[in-house]
Amino acid sequence: MTRGERVIAFIERFCIVPEGKLIGQPMRLDPFQKDFILAVYDNPAGTDMAILSIARKNGKTGLIAGILLAHLVGPEAVQNTQIVSGALSREQAAIVFNLAVKMVNLNPKLQEIVHITPSGKKLIGLPCNVEYKALSAEGKTTHGLSPILAILDETGQVRGPQDDFIDAITTAQGAHENPLLIVISTQAANDADLLSIWIDDAVKSKDPHIVCHVYEAPKDADISKRESWLAANPALGTFRSEKDMARQAEKAGRMPSFENTFRNLNLNQRVSTVSPFISRSVWELCGEMPINTPRKWYAGLDLSARNDLTALVIAGEADDGVWDVFPFFWTPQKTLEERTKTDRAPYDVWVREGLLRTTPGASVDYSFVVADIAEIIGDFDLTSMAFDRWRIDQFRKDADAIGLSLPLVEFGQGFKDMGPAVDTLESLMLNGRVRHGMHPVLTMCAVNAVVVKDAAGNRKLDKSKATGRIDGMVAMTMSVGAANGEVTEQGGDFDDFIFRPLSM
């Protein structure tokens, strides 16, 4: 028998189904589960990392429990080693642990060789003295570990490209010559999230040491079709209820607000459960590199709060009717590392790549922004620069200090001014009349951007409801609005006072 076949044989011989309609029966792995195990353990190159991404309710937790028991007292047990499972919440971590305990208690042979410590969420495999711990991001037990096997459950819930808890687990494996990291999860909502980055890297790099099995429905899948369900639910009809799937699909069909949730959790698609202003496919349609040729250019300036992103977006219509977009961003240097973690965005990487500029100190120093803008606009025949008046006074002073004259025009952030600009930008994007070059910082802002409506149906971007920074999209919308002459009078829009938070 191969190594993978021994793992399968152990699970099907010693692991008992602990709950559900098949309770008490020997566990029988579905073909997709066997395929994954064989790919991981019989990989000629050796497997360092394995990813299995499937929709919810496809036997994920049972597979995790079976694999960890194979490493605890089965054919993969290694003398005096440690294995862990990790989840973001205590509840999720407890589910894996409790399922493994139930499997042990249902088999007298396993009961004899596994010591259970419920209070510490710990199992000891007595034959080889292997210790298993169920960890959660809410706990404080990740440091001092050295697991030869780590299984991460529902990593798709991590927002952004980094997570301290997961870092602590993965870096703790460095003491072993052949550690194994297994990730079993439904997909993340966005391309910029950690699991998406791991999956994309596995696909692009073709690293032979990474096994990656992803079951997902096509982007344009019809949510009512069985073939769409089957693409993401390989256990459909066995331990994934087809009747329940049909109910969920019917609900998504009659309730548009539920469709994104269904697509993410049940079709395993990268779809945010919050409806974005611009869909990923539309954004990518406009991803060609922008072209700087002589024309009239319009800018939008979003200064935001002094410790957030400051964004300048310059846009202009080319002879072919397409709008070319050039974004520029600034952020405080002193708090860069902290905000890289809190915002879950690779600001530090973008700074190194020249995509994000920094200013000294803990808040954005507008004098440095002004100096940069003076250099930037030398490449553009700038007609107007739309700005949000709430934070413009210091910016004006810094511009005056170096003798910089800018064609500044006030632009309200309420529904009155933002509404037409949002409509215009959306129309341009939907018709492929934008070239933004997939600038990573602007793309992050686009992914995060959501809109809200007033009673009349007017829309505006809303930072309070966004899933992350949207400053670049606000500036981009303002630049398009400035081009159409959609600017406020000196007094501003009443909506600004009612609907806009005073600080962000």
UniProtKB/Swiss-Prot annotation:
Name of protein: Terminase, large subunit
UniProt binding sites for Mg(2+): 471
Effect of residue 56 to A: Almost complete loss of ATPase and DNA packaging activities
Short sequence motif named Walker A motif, residue ranges: 54-61
Regulation of activity: Inhibited by zinc.
GO molecular function, one term: endonuclease activity
Keyword ATP-binding: yes
Cofactor: Mg(2+); Mn(2+)
Motif Walker B motif per record, residues: 149-154
Protein family: Belongs to the Hendrixvirinae large terminase family.
Subunit details: Homopentamer; forms a ring-like structure through which genomic DNA is translocated into the capsid. Interacts with the terminase small subunit; the active complex is composed of a pentamer ring of terminase large subunits and a nonamer ring of terminase small subunits. Interacts with the portal protein; this interaction allows the packaging of viral DNA.
Species this chain originates from: Enterobacteria phage HK97
Effect of substituting residue 60 to A: Almost complete loss of ATPase and DNA packaging activities
Domain of life: Viruses
Keyword Ligase: no
Keywords, alphabetical: ATP-binding, Endonuclease, Hydrolase, Magnesium, Metal-binding, Nuclease, Nucleotide-binding, Viral genome packaging, Viral release from host cell
PANTHER family referenced in this protein's UniProt entry, alphabetically: PROTEIN YMFN (PTHR41287:SF1), PTHR41287
Entry's EC annotation: 3.1.21.-, 3.6.4.-
Function noted in UniProt: The terminase large subunit acts as an ATP driven molecular motor necessary for viral DNA translocation into empty capsids and as an endonuclease that cuts the viral genome from the concetamer to initiate and to end a packaging reaction. The terminase lies at a unique vertex of the procapsid and is composed of two subunits, a small terminase subunit involved in viral DNA recognition (packaging sequence), and a large terminase subunit possessing endonucleolytic and ATPase activities. Both terminase subunits heterooligomerize and are docked on the portal protein to form the packaging machine.
Pfam families, per the entry: TerL_ATPase, TerL_nuclease
Domain-level remarks: The ATPase region is in the N-terminus, whereas the nuclease region is in the C-terminus.
Region (ATPase activity): 1-204
InterPro entries: P-loop_NTPase, TerL_ATPase, TerL_nuclease, Terminase_largesu-like
Location of the region described as Nuclease activity in the Swiss-Prot/TrEMBL record: 326-415
